[in-house]
């Protein structure tokens, strides 16, 4: 790498302060927006300190009009000894003090027709090593194709403001990351996901060398994005969240539901809990770095259920979720999706 490339890949002089300010502002904007959307619920804030260095503020909304439970966290942690999960991915960071900051959010609505949603944007530094990561994904229980397309469109547009190739990789990467291997299904309908973005190399930096995201990244070739590009990406994607989710709530919040729909929602929430406890790297990182357990596990649903050997009734609305919406799809280009959803009144 040339010296000019080295310079291009250096973080901004005030990188840590700017990254912290960005995620704090995202937390504030999202919480204010969600309180307005809910109309009744209010976030309660609890600040905490990490003995080894740093801390954060956790905000939780319970028993609102729309949201059964939701949390929006901010954390800024630092230390001298890197957790194993980081060293295994970036061994060159070993021996350096480190800094990490981010905001994360999970919302569990009451109405089964309103999807659960997750967001996370973060920044990490350790000596010469730095990167941005983040994304947002939607987990419906009674999905609609129009809702799915709207969510994806908002996040694609945000990525496109930086580079029109980003979404080509980040969308399949999301499908790959939020995948329950033991269930052979995605957690939901996806969105975007990216990690270890330091402005160099291929866009895909995940673990599945033979997957779709990796294949597309190889076709695109090496990318040269700088710190400012990636900072702007996190900002654009973070600010795309409320416009991507609020219209879905407005369309679905007054739909009536029965015990049957509620039971299915709780059953599918069990899948959400399984992913977060078994596969999620953020959970693993937080526990390995002695983060605040209550905040780390805030993403878990307030209620969930498991049922041995459950199978949805054939051709039912529940079967549509497991047959179509828990598998990676090309939501915009595959026209067969419209016909299948129309049959189940799941188009709009």
UniProtKB/Swiss-Prot annotation:
Cofactors, names only: a divalent metal cation
InterPro entries xrefs: Coprogen_oxidase_aer (IPR001260), Coprogen_oxidase_aer_sf (IPR036406), Coprogen_oxidase_CS (IPR018375)
Positions bearing the site annotation: Important for dimerization: 182
One GO cellular component, as annotated: cytoplasm
Transmembrane domains' residue ranges: none
Alphabetically ordered keywords of this record: Chlorophyll biosynthesis, Cytoplasm, Heme biosynthesis, Metal-binding, Oxidoreductase, Porphyrin biosynthesis
Subcellular location: Cytoplasm
Pathway stated in the Swiss-Prot or TrEMBL entry: Porphyrin-containing compound metabolism; protoporphyrin-IX biosynthesis; protoporphyrinogen-IX from coproporphyrinogen-III (O2 route): step 1/1
Entry annotated with the keyword Cytoplasm: yes
Residues at the active site: 118 (proton donor)
Biological process, per Gene Ontology: chlorophyll biosynthetic process; protoporphyrinogen IX biosynthetic process
Residue sites binding a divalent metal cation per the record: 108, 118, 152, 182
A Pfam family of this chain: Coprogen_oxidas
Enzyme class: oxidoreductase
Region annotation Important for dimerization: where it falls in the sequence: 272-307
Residues annotated as binding substrate: 104, 120-122
Catalytic activity: coproporphyrinogen III + O2 + 2 H(+) = protoporphyrinogen IX + 2 CO2 + 2 H2O
Subunit architecture: Homodimer.
Family, per entry: Belongs to the aerobic coproporphyrinogen-III oxidase family.
Name of the molecule in the record: Oxygen-dependent coproporphyrinogen-III oxidase
């Amino acid at each position: 790498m040339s010296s000019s490339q080295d310079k291009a890949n250096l973080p901004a002089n005030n990188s840590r302060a700017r990254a912290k300010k960005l995620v704090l502002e995202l937390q504030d904007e999202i919480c204010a927006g969600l309180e307005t959307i809910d109309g009744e619920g209010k976030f309660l804030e609890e600040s905490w300190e990490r003995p080894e260095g740093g801390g954060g503020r956790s905000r939780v909304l319970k028993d609102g009009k729309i949201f059964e439970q939701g949390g929006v966290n901010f954390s800024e942690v630092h230390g001298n000894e890197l957790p194993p999960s980081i060293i295994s991915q970036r061994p060159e960071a070993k021996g350096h003090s480190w800094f990490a900051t981010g905001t994360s959010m999970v919302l569990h609505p009451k109405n089964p027709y309103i999807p659960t949603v997750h967001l996370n944007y973060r920044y990490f530094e350790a000596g010469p090593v730095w990167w941005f990561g983040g994304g947002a994904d939607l987990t419906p229980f009674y999905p609609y194709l129009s809702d799915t397309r709207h969510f994806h469109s908002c996040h694609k547009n945000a990525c496109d403001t930086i580079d029109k190739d980003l979404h080509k990789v980040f969308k399949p990467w999301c499908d790959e990351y939020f995948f329950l291997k033991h269930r052979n299904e995605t957690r939901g309908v996806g969105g975007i996901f990216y990690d270890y973005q330091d402005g160099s190399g291929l866009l895909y930096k995940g673990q599945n060398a033979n997957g779709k995201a990796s294949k597309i990244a190889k076709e695109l070739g090496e990318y040269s994005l700088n710190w400012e590009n990636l900072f702007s990406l996190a900002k654009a994607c973070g600010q795309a969240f409320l416009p991507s989710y609020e219209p879905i709530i407005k369309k679905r919040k007054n739909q009536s539901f029965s015990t049957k729909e509620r039971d299915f929602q709780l059953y599918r929430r069990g899948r959400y809990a399984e992913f977060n406890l078994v596969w999620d790297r953020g959970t693993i990182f937080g526990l390995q770095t002695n983060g605040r357990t209550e905040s780390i596990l805030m993403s878990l649903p307030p209620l969930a259920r498991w049922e041995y050997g459950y199978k949805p009734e054939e051709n039912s609305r529940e079967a549509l979720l497991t047959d179509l919406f828990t598998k990676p799809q090309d939501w915009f280009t595959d026209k067969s999706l419209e016909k299948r959803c129309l049959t189940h009144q799941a188009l709009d």
